[in-house]
Swiss-Prot record:
ATP binds at A396, P397, P398, G399, Y400, G401, K402, T403. GO terms for molecular function: ATP binding; ATP hydrolysis activity; DNA helicase activity; nucleic acid binding. InterPro entries: DEAD/DEAH_box_helicase_dom, Helicase_ATP-bd, Helicase_C-like, P-loop_NTPase, RLR_Helicase. Belongs to the helicase family. Yeast subtelomeric Y' repeat subfamily. The protein tested in started on residue 386; there are 4 identical proteins in yeast. Residues 840-864, 880-1007 are annotated as: Disordered. Residues 880-983 have a biased composition (Low complexity). It comes from the Eukaryota. This is Y' element ATP-dependent helicase protein 1 copy 4. Catalyzes DNA unwinding and is involved in telomerase-independent telomere maintenance. Residues 984-1007 have a biased composition (Basic and acidic residues). Signal peptide: none annotated. Residues 383-560 form the Helicase ATP-binding domain. It comes from Saccharomyces cerevisiae (strain ATCC 204508 / S288c) (Baker's yeast).
Length: 1382
């Protein structure tokens, strides 16, 4: 719009040209006169030669402007009035009541806006009072606000007058107007009044023809600040401004009573009651001379402007040397006259801060679902970013998120384009430095560099945050750089807009507790703290006494000794000396929350014979349970660190760090451990316990028997999300020796009680709740931590049973990865099929009722092996020896983790046969051992998809035949193991060799090393998945995995989701494991798994469907095409977005849970669109029910196919549907007429499997069906009550057909969601069915089921009753459906 208007003069050049020009005089009386004069406005005081420069273009081009553009100009200027009112309200400081603001006038008899000729600031004289008896108050605006007001009156209002034109007449004569200059006021027209108003009053709504209303003005208070938990009303804001003016502005109130009294009067407060405070009986501005009253009020305004800093960045140069002729000459010399006007040379005003900046920063860093941990974290971020407190100390428990307290404000500062802020962060150790660099530079929100770069090269103008250690902070080079900051910046960047931001010191308690390093900290006292905008000190272990001593040790004043409010701090004389003399304000979140830290970690104190041996045992157990986890081990000495690293290196990958390493090496090793997923254990001295954030960390082991309470808390605090902490000490050797000058070591006993004592929390010794995560208490631990403890305990019991020593553990740990390990689980609850996994030693799984001479029976999900050869540590049982002509049966039942061998030995001249016939998908192994001259035959007949292994061991001169007959798709292995001097033959294929006869090319039974390596990889992957999805041993679903509560899952539960929900080709491959869709040799399912990965993948896909409409879901299926045959890979892909998906469901389905879970009532009268756009929403409950029964009566009489009718109003006949007696016949009738085929081709049902809709009529909705059938009697009573002829209410299958048809009817869905404003879109059929059965309040406040309202809306959309604009859509749907059907 402004481009269309052409060269409109801008604010700052115009202020310099007119308002700052000493040739323009503004000397005039400061009050309006009784008679209206045309020039009674400071606009009229501007010489004509200057006014001609301001608006000639707009006036000349007025006739060329279209009516639309003129209206756009007028409306745009109206929108600027409210922000200008707020600018004035805050700029004057001493608050107005709203009528004072509303009636500001720059001309006419009510004029109260003037320009002070000396200061060239706008001055306001107002005299509003409830009784009208007060004298005028004079308030002066700051320079910038004066520029805006002056520009608004002299430029924007004149533009608005030109745009509205001479015919504008929106204003009527109101009592607040003082219409003068007319002989007969009754003859004044609206056009005359409108012209007077436009040339007099500032804040108008020209569209409505009135002054700006209070409702419009207060809208800003309701909206801003956006993320404030509670907003002030106008009255509260007035009182707040008064309090600020009374307590904060100026420091001479105590010595100058007139100054104090003037401040009260300017806030419209009477001083007569302030006798005891001010020492005067009464005071008014009329009691002093006129000039004194003016000076008192001007000084009060000046104090406010200085205190608020409104002119701290405001510097103007007056163009007093230029005259009008020069300007006019410039105009004639160039068409671009605005380029010749003198410019204002001022420093760019500082971009204002907002509390919303922190929220924006959080979303940049963590994504759109970002939320603060709690209100304490939100308040502290705002305190650090917004408040003027120059020095802040924070104590929060380890793992609370202290880094975000300064990280988010730093990102917010970096977003300000007017000033470049350079901040510094210092940490105690180099180890922590590497971790901080990684965390703070993520997402690219901040430019982060080592502080060494700054010390050596100076500020580069790009870096937002320099990170260093305490040694850098104390270095002379750093303090010298800070001392010379202003000169360096001015010389390097030629600007003063590069400023020092925050000085942040993490874990600052070390200044006091690290006695041996205190000599190194001496240089910090030389640092110029006053150069920084703010100093922030953070720690998880700094109670008030420690914090105060630490701050004083580096040269600061220390903590505030008493609770001081901002008013006292502002008036403190010490403030003038800078930050170093300012007391630091302490925020102790641990005391505020009254929660003992570290309650989420299970802390175990154990006395053992050998600390390293016990630690190794714990670590190996952890990595067997959680292969991807990490651990930290804290040792006493540097020698012990290196010894442990050398001895443990053969078991897992370790990283070791101690103080004797160089800084670069420490950084490199820490970064390697944090970023490399294969690194398992970090071994070091206590320097590895502070500040490091490792996501996979699950265990901390402390071998140092001299740890003090701070070191203990810091070490345990590394376990952010819970885990195990072991304190290992030698028996009878726990020493309570105190190192000189340091805190004493922790004592034997309750750890939690010692933590409470350290933080100054209330002791609970001997009371309920004393033990929190210690002394065997598990009450406060998370479910994951409790499960980890139980799994560790179970593993310890098994190891004790097997009598394994710690030295043998690694080999058995590796051995368990081999392909010889028994396979115990392969099937899933969803499928009746059994998966088959062959191993090297011919294992057997036989189903019930199989007939076998050598029979092995295994329990559910247990693998059984019948073989003659047993490996080490495997028990062999069930051995039978028969005499001549005997019949042999060897039957074995194997329990968990036991290998079973069934062996039969026959005597001379005995013929033994082992014949097995198995059922579908069985795995059979038949083993026979014969003596001399015996004849042995092992024959197996298998059915489809079977896996058969026949193994024979023959003694000297024996003859062995292993024959296998397999049907289609069978997999056969014939293996012979020879004893001494034995010979064997394989006759599976007489003319072929072993390489050609393998049916499974993946497994090479002759390559043992290859087999072992492959099996180890599979086992490792299996353990990873088990750790990632641990609850699949229970009847869990994907909503539990996402983190929903049980009451939410109850209503969001994804019932009816099975393999048929997935489109063809998605997780539906055959011939593979039914649980994970991998080849049998690569199966990653594990023993005891009740919910397969494939089922989880189905449900995960359903969750994604919940969040997407049809088009988005179709695109999503294309996006995940690489995972169509890999449900395990898809689950990993899905779990990456776990938090985001959870938040999105919470947002999108909040209304759904409110209706279904909390049973919030839906009232049709609350839907404005419904009442206006549908007759149904004005019907009573009785009328809706009558209409519902009538629709079903008509459908029954005409034998109309229900699903097709509700899908697109097609009235095809289907008599078989109405005559069907059971669900099977009903579905067959629908399938016969092609309903399901049309549904898939026309609607989003095509995005599911071909059987999905059909199976809805069989087994998925039992609970809903039961509820519906129980309600049939109620429907009969309703019909009798309504006086209608009782008709049969639709049976369940017809009712379900109706709801399915409505669900896939896109036109109806869009209409219903538009009319019924309380509901939104649902994309899963189960959710739609649940929603349809909630109750709504009709227009007469009677309750009816929502499905009855749906049928009424559907009927209204029928061709005879379709609203305007919808008939063509219905016809199109009908035509397309008939075409498909025919």
């Amino acid at each position: 719009m402004w481009k269309t208007l052409g060269r409109v003069e801008q604010l700052l050049p115009y202020a310099s040209l007119i308002l700052r020009n000493r040739e323009v005089l503004f000397r005039e009386p400061k009050r309006g006169i009784d008679e209206y004069l045309e020039n009674d406005s400071f606009f009229q005081m501007i010489p004509v030669k200057y006014r001609e420069i301001v608006l000639p273009k707009l006036r000349r081009d007025t006739n060329k402007m279209t009516a639309a553009l003129k209206n756009k100009v007028a409306v745009a200027i109206d929108e600027l009035t409210v922000p200008l009112m707020w600018m004035i309200h805050f700029a004057v400081g001493y608050p107005y009541r709203y009528p004072e603001l509303q009636l500001l006038a720059f001309a006419g008899p009510q004029r109260n806006v003037y320009v002070d000729d000396t200061t060239r600031r706008i001055q306001l004289y107002t005299d509003y009072n409830k009784n009208g008896s007060s004298e005028p108050r004079l308030k002066t605006l700051d320079g910038l606000t004066s520029d805006y007001v002056f520009y608004f009156v002299t430029v924007l209002r004149q533009m608005q007058i030109c745009a509205l034109g001479n015919s504008y007449d929106a204003f009527n004569h109101d009592p607040w107007m003082d219409v003068v200059g007319f002989e007969d006021p009754d003859q004044v027209t609206n056009r005359d009044i409108s012209r007077i108003v436009l040339y007099s009053y500032m804040f108008l709504n020209t569209a409505k023809g009135c002054l700006v209303e209070y409702a419009t003005f207060r809208q800003y208070m309701r909206e801003l600040p956006k993320n404030a938990p509670q907003k002030l009303n106008f009255r509260e804001m007035r009182q707040g401004l008064i309090a600020l003016g009374r307590h904060c502005v100026g420091s001479r109130f105590e010595t100058d009573l007139y100054e104090s009294a003037t401040s009260e009067l300017m806030a419209n407060h009477s001083v007569q009651t302030g006798r005891n405070i001010y020492g005067v009986d009464s005071f008014s501005l009329t009691s002093v001379s006129g000039t004194t009253a003016t000076l008192l009020q001007e000084r009060a305004s000046e104090r406010w402007i200085q205190w608020l800093g409104l002119e701290s960045d405001y510097h103007c140069s007056f163009s007093s040397t230029r005259n009008a002729e020069d300007v006019v000459a410039g105009e004639a010399a160039s068409s671009d006259h605005h380029q010749k006007i003198s410019r204002v040379t001022r420093k760019r005003p500082r971009e204002p801060k907002s509390t919303n900046d922190i929220l924006v920063a959080g979303r940049k860093l963590f994504g759109s679902s970002f939320e603060f941990r709690d209100l304490h974290q939100l308040r502290l971020c705002h305190e650090i970013y917004m408040a003027d407190t120059p020095s802040v100390a924070v104590q929060a428990p380890p793992g609370y998120g202290k880094t975000e307290l300064f990280h988010l404000p730093l990102i917010a500062l970096a977003s300000k384009g007017d000033v470049k802020y350079v901040s510094f962060l210092f940490v105690p150790y180099t180890v922590l430095l590497a971790n901080c660099m990684i965390r703070l530079s993520r997402c690219g929100c901040l430019n982060v560099a080592p502080v060494r770069n700054f010390i050596e090269e100076g500020c580069d103008g790009v870096t937002d945050l320099y990170v260093g250690i305490y040694d850098d902070l104390a270095s002379t080079n750093f303090t010298d750089r800070i001392a010379a900051w202003e000169n360096i910046v001015e010389c390097t960047f030629r600007t003063n807009n590069v400023k020092l931001g925050y000085l942040i010191v993490d874990e600052f308690h070390n200044f006091e507790t690290e006695v041996y390093r205190q000599s190194q900290f001496g240089g910090i006292t030389n640092l110029d703290f006053d150069a920084f905008e703010k100093a922030i000190f953070l720690s998880g272990t700094a109670p008030e006494a420690v914090a105060d001593a630490a701050l004083q040790r580096i040269g600061l004043t220390g903590l505030a000794k008493k609770s001081m409010d901002i008013n006292e701090l502002k008036r403190s004389e010490d403030l003038s000396r800078g930050l170093s003399s300012y007391p630091t304000r302490m925020f102790n979140l641990i005391k505020e929350k009254s929660e003992v830290p570290l309650g989420h970690v299970h802390k175990i104190w154990k006395k053992v014979e050998s600390q390293p041996e016990e630690a190794l045992k714990l670590l190996l157990a952890l990595f067997e349970i959680e292969p991807e986890s990490k651990a930290i081990v804290v040792a006493s000495t540097t020698n012990e660190v290196e010894e442990l690293a050398c001895s443990w290196r053969k078991y897992f990958r370790v990283v070791w760090i101690h103080g004797k390493l160089g800084a670069a090496e420490k950084v490199s090793r820490t970064k390697e451990f944090v970023t490399d997923g294969s690194m398992r254990v970090l071994i070091g001295t206590k320097l590895v316990t502070e500040g490091i954030d490792i996501k996979q960390l699950m265990m901390v082991i402390m071998l140092d028997n001299r740890l003090n309470i701070i070191e203990l808390i810091q070490g345990v605090g590394r376990l952010r999300d819970g885990g195990l902490c072991y304190l290992l000490s030698r028996k009878n050797s726990w020493a309570a020796r105190n190192r000189k000058g340091e805190l004493p070591p922790i004592k034997e006993g309750c750890i939690t009680e010692q933590v409470r004592e350290f933080y100054g929390l209330e002791s609970k010794k001997g009371k309920k709740g004393q033990h929190v995560g210690c002394c065997g208490s598990r009450t406060d631990l998370s479910a994951d931590t409790v499960e980890l403890i139980e799994r560790m305990d179970r593993l310890a019991e098994k190891q004790a049973t097997a009598s394994m020593s710690i030295i043998a553990l690694p080999s058995s740990f590796q051995e368990s990865n081999s392909s010889d390990r028994c396979r115990k689980y392969c099937s899933s609850d969803e499928d009746s099929d059994t998966c088959i996994h062959g191993s090297a030693n011919a294992s057997t799984n036989a189903t019930t009722n199989s007939s076998t001479n050598a029979t092995t029976t295994a329990s559910t999900n247990v693998r059984t092996s019948a073989t003659t050869t047993a490996s080490i540590n495997v028990r062999t049982s069930a051995i039978t020896t028969e005499s001549t002509n005997s019949s042999t049966n060897a039957t074995t039942t194997a329990s968990t983790n036991v290998r079973t061998s069934a062996t039969t030995t026959a005597s001379i001249n005995v013929r033994t046969s082992a014949t097995t016939t198995e059922s579908t998908n069985s795995n059979t192994s038949a083993t026979t051992t014969e003596s001399t001259d015996s004849n042995t035959s092992a024959t197996t007949t298998e059915s489809t998809d079977s896996n058969t292994s026949a193994t024979t061991t023959a003694s000297t001169n024996s003859s062995t035949n292993a024959t296998t007959t397999a049907s289609t798709n069978s997999s056969t292995n014939a293996t012979t193991t020879e004893s001494t001097n034995a010979s064997a033959k394989e006759d599976a294929n007489k003319d072929g060799n072993a390489e050609d006869n393998r049916f499974h090319p993946v497994t090479d039974i002759n390559k043992e090393s290859y087999k072992r390596k492959g099996s180890q990889m599979v086992l490792l992957e299996r353990k990873k998945l088990k750790a990632q999805f641990p609850n699949t041993s229970e009847n869990m679903n994907v909503l539990q995995f996402l983190g929903f509560r049980s009451d939410e899952i109850k209503h969001l539960f994804l019932y009816g989701i099975d393999v048929y929900f997935c489109p063809e080709g998605v997780f539906t491959q055959y011939g593979l494991c039914k649980g994970c869709q991998k080849m049998f040799e690569l199966c990653v399912c594990w023993a005891g798994q009740k919910v397969s990965y494939r089922r989880m993948a189905w449900e995960a896909l359903a969750v994604e469907r919940m969040l997407r409409n049809d088009e988005e879901y179709k695109e999503y299926l294309e996006d995940i095409e690489p995972y169509h045959g890999d449900p395990v890979g898809y689950l990993k892909y899905f779990s990456v977005k776990r938090g985001e998906i959870y938040s999105q469901i919470q947002r999108n389905y909040a209304w759904y849970l409110a209706i279904t879970r909390r049973r919030e009532t839906i009232s049709v009268l609350d839907s404005t669109r419904g009442k206006q756009g549908s007759q149904v929403f004005r019907m009573s409950g009785r009328q809706i029910k009558e209409l519902y029964y009538k629709v079903w009566s008509n459908l029954r009489e005409s034998k109309t196919e229900v699903l097709q009718y509700f899908l697109n109003w097609d009235e095809k006949k289907c008599r078989e549907e109405w005559e069907a007696k059971d669900d099977t016949v009903f579905v067959e009738a629908l399938e016969k007429v092609g309903v399901f085929q049309r549904l898939r081709s026309m609607t989003s049902a095509g995005l599911q499997g071909p059987q999905y809709v059909k199976l809805q009529f069989s087994r998925h909705h039992r609970q809903l069906r039961s509820r519906y059938e129980l309600s049939l009697g109620m429907h009969l009573r309703d019909q009798l009550a309504l006086g209608v002829t009782p008709s049969k209410v639709p049976h369940w299958t017809a009712f379900l057909s109706m709801l399915i048809g409505l669900f896939y009817n896109k036109t109806f869905r869009q209409k219903l969601e538009y009319l019924l404003e309380q509901i939104s879109e649902v994309w899963l059929l189960p959710h739609w069915l649940d929603l349809a059965n909630v109750e709504v309040l009709a227009a007469d406040n009677t309750r009816v089921p929502l499905y009855m309202l749906m049928v009424a809306v559907h009927k209204e959309l029928d061709s005879d009753d379709v609203p305007d604009g919808r008939f063509d859509i219905i016809l199109l749907c009908r035509d397309s459906s008939r075409e498909v059907g025919e």
